[in-house]
A protein has these predicted regions:
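Metal-dependent amide/peptide-bond hydrolase catalytic core
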Residues: 3, 50, 186-389
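Acidic/histidine-rich catalytic neighborhood of metal-dependent amide-processing enzymes
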Residues: 110-184, 388-389
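A structural signal for isolated positions on well-ordered beta-strands in alpha/beta enzyme cores
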Residues: 45, 73, 134-136, 300
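Short, conserved micro-motifs enriched in small and acidic residues
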Residues: 102-114, 142, 203-206, 367-374
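N-terminal helical capping/dimerization or prosegment-like subdomains
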Residues: 1-84, 257-261, 278
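Acidic, glycine-rich active-site loops and adjacent beta-strand->loop/helix elements
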Residues: 52, 78-79, 101, 136-145, ...
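Active-site metal-coordination/substrate-binding segment of hydrolases
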Residues: 69-134
Length: 389
């Protein structure tokens, strides 16, 4: 079989060697990306998080005439999920090649994609581009598409107005046009502790947490049975789940605190803001009832993470461009979420297309097949031709 270029393999190895687990800083990797870009004459801009421990990186390879507006975004996230508790056959932060596969944390999701881009920088620079190529690398995708929000805002602020975007999440180089939104919430009920033999002197926070969780399950059932639905998804309806509940300190103590974590993933036709408001209103009613019983009680409703879904029309130019670059056409929609919806919501029609199989992402002994890297290289080569004058 054809092997990936030595440039791609070298860049992928360098990226994997940097542990960018979401809980930690990604700045060493941003330093590396920045240096690689500077080495070929490309300026970039960092967009930091609030405490400057992490950063996005945005760079533009201008068209041959110097234009920076329009063109295409190549987007990828720099963080990876933890390896804690996983049984790996080799060091997860050192690339190992076995059986025509590369093993290591992030090989599939999604440092191989970024590595291919870095390996192709000389070709990007030497091409006589008729349209610019924008490189957008984010932080904290794995914990809720956090960094991409300010990254997309920066693209809008610079008035780059890209005509389309490719998000290189592992799709086996299939052109994915749709996925659901992602919405994660934490609802905290604060009651009053008391001895369990004197319940009237306390206010049971778990009781209110359970009532709230039951309401969420009722809505989940409603969405599952009444729709709307989209048969392109394995799970054709909007899904909603209570996934974590914490509360109480002892069996003989009325619990003063209970926290309910829930999430929903909605179809594009569902108004996610209206759905959130409906649930929040019920939580607020419970909070008012608690305060009426005891003024010390309270309720807080917090959205922890969220990103819009993706539903790119097949007639969009970016879909045709993906096909011309060798992406495999796909009519199904994927269950996982990506940053693609943020780019699309900002006016850039977006396709998810990258090397690797999502089934290998996040797993112990994460890997990517070498032929997937080769396919991604071919995609980039054809993209250069398509965008050249």
């Amino acid at each position: 079989m054809t092997r990936p270029s030595s440039a791609s393999l070298r860049e992928i190895s360098d990226l994997i060697a940097l542990d960018t687990t979401s809980r930690d800083t990604n700045l060493p990797l941003i330093d590396l990306l920045e240096a690689k870009l500077q080495a070929v004459g490309i300026d970039s801009k960092r967009i930091y998080n609030e405490d400057r421990s992490k950063a996005n990186l945005l760079a533009t390879i201008p068209a041959d005439d110097g234009s920076r507006r329009g063109g295409v975004v190549l987007s990828g996230h720099t963080d990876v999920v933890p390896v804690d508790g996983q049984n790996w056959s080799s060091d997860p932060f050192t690339v190992h090649e076995r059986d025509e596969k590369l093993y290591g944390r992030g090989t599939c999701d999604m440092k191989s994609y970024i590595g291919v881009i870095l390996g192709k920088l000389p070709e990007f620079i030497s091409a006589k581009l008729s349209q610019p190529i924008h490189l957008a690398f984010s932080y904290d995708e794995e914990i809720g598409c956090v960094g991409a929000v300010s990254l997309v805002d920066e693209i809008v602020s610079q008035e780059l107005a890209p005509r389309g975007c490719f998000v290189g999440e592992p799709s086996s180089m299939r052109a994915i046009r749709g996925h659901k939104s992602m919405n994660v919430f934490k609802v905290s009920f604060h009651g009053v502790a008391a001895h369990s033999s004197l319940p009237s002197e306390g206010l049971n926070a778990i009781s209110y947490g359970l009532r709230f969780a039951s309401f969420v399950e009722e809505i989940a059932h409603e969405l599952r049975t009444e729709g709307p639905s989209d048969p392109a998804f394995i799970e054709p309806t909007t899904t909603m789940n209570v996934n974590l509940i914490n509360g109480g300190i002892a069996v003989n103590t009325i619990p003063s605190d209970c926290t309910v974590h829930f999430e929903f993933r909605s179809l594009a036709v569902v108004d996610r803001e209206a759905l959130t408001t409906r649930i929040k209103n019920f939580a607020s009613q419970l909070g008012e009832e608690m305060r009426a019983r005891n003024p010390q009680a309270s309720m807080t409703f917090e959205q922890v993470a969220g990103a819009p879904g993706l539903d790119t029309d097949p007639s969009e130019e970016i879909v045709d461009l993906a096909a011309r670059c060798g992406a495999i056409a796909a009519d199904d929609k994927v269950t996982y979420g990506t940053e693609a919806g943020l780019f699309a919501a900002a006016g850039s029609p977006t396709v998810v297309c990258g090397p690797g199989d999502i089934a290998q992402a996040h797993a112990p002994d994460e890997f990517i097949e070498l032929e997937q890297i080769v396919a991604c290289e071919g995609f980039m080569d054809q993209l250069i031709k398509e965008l050249s004058s």
